[in-house]
């Protein structure tokens, strides 16, 4: 029997899964076209190459979309660009922390900081808060933690 976890997912299939999330995001006025979903799949692939990461199970882009779609700081105009930046930032932090933070915890912390201390600023999220996340995760050796504004 083939292990489903290790079966590669085609970019077309992944883009289709992203478009299917429109059912969840439309209530917030956010919608992706198939072309935009393909763009996000390509951003993910480039980010993985840039950081030297390998992804065994698809769905990370969908988890980021689900986590951020309710943010008051997202708009239709910058939705794809913001998601692209979040995908890249996610991979950067995972690499810099040697995967000491689970995907779920990292996404939760990114969303909390984005809506909280960063007030929707990707620059603040990348430059200040995420650098603190990396330092703290590395200092604690991966112990579970929650980020605070003074972290």
Give, region by region, the residue ranges found by the protein language model.
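Short terminal alpha-helical segments
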Residues: 1-49
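Extended, low-complexity, Ser/Thr/Pro-rich intrinsically disordered regulatory regions enriched
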Residues: 2, 138-151
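Acidic, low-complexity, intrinsically disordered interaction modules
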Residues: 34-35, 39-144
């Amino acid at each position: 029997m083939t292990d489903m976890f290790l079966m590669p997912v085609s970019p077309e299939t992944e883009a289709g899964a992203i478009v299917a999330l429109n059912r969840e995001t439309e209530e917030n006025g956010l919608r992706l076209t198939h072309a935009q979903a393909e763009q996000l799949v390509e951003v993910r692939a480039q980010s993985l190459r840039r950081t030297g990461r390998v992804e065994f199970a698809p769905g990370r882009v969908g988890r980021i979309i689900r986590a951020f779609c309710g943010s008051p700081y997202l708009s239709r105009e910058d939705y794809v660009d913001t998601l692209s930046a979040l995908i890249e930032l996610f991979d950067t932090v995972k690499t810099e922390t040697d995967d000491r933070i689970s995907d779920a915890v990292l996404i939760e912390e990114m969303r909390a900081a984005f809506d909280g201390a960063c007030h929707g600023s990707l620059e603040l999220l990348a430059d200040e808060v995420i650098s603190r996340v990396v330092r703290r995760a590395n200092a604690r050796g991966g112990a579970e933690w929650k980020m605070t504004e003074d972290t």
